[in-house]
Design a protein with these regions (language model features):
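Short glycine-rich anion-binding loops that position phosphate/pyrophosphate groups of nucleotides
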Residues: 9-11, 76-79, 102-104
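Glycine- and acidic-residue-enriched helix-capping/strand-helix junction motifs
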Residues: 14-28
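Short, structured coil segments at secondary-structure junctions
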Residues: 41, 92, 118-119
Length: 144
């Protein structure tokens, strides 16, 4: 199974940002942990991070043309307003999971709305970095 993991704006600063919201795990450790988990699950995991909306759209279009079995995406702040990322995700027929480290519905009002959620199959929010592992496990359980 081939899964694309996309992390959006500011996620490369995990470990430097507000630990009460995002925990203390840094980005490199998160990716290393997820790659190990994916290997145990016999999953081919490609990880991508960008602070640029267009780069994320380009990566999604590339993945569409190459073919992937599933997408896990944490768009960061793009969650709340990026119709470009939403539209790029919408063309996929594979499973798509939106992940958020913090509980976006218990934060500032502007964070409560996700324009991404309607084009995803599942939203995981508020489980910390464990949410990424839950997404991987779920995708393996539904046996794409």
């Amino acid at each position: 199974m081939k899964i694309l993991l996309i992390n959006g704006v500011n996620l490369n600063f995990l470990g430097l940002r507000d630990a009460t919201q995002y925990g203390s795990t840094n980005y490199e450790d998160l990716i290393n942990s997820l790659e190990k988990k994916a290997k145990k699950l016999n999953v081919d995991l490609e990880c991508f991070q960008s602070n640029h909306e267009g780069a994320i759209v380009d990566k999604l279009q590339e993945a569409y043309l190459k073919g992937v079995d599933a997408i896990i995406i944490n768009p960061g702040a793009f969650t709340h307003y990026s119709y470009a990322i939403r539209d790029a995700l919408e063309i996929f027929t594979c499973k798509k999971i939106e992940v958020h480290i913090s509980h976006i519905h218990k934060r500032e009002a502007f964070r409560h709305t996700s324009v991404i959620a309607p084009v995803c199959d599942v939203q995981i929010s508020g489980f910390g970095v464990k949410g990424y592992e839950l997404a991987l496990e779920y995708l393996c359980e539904v046996a794409l």
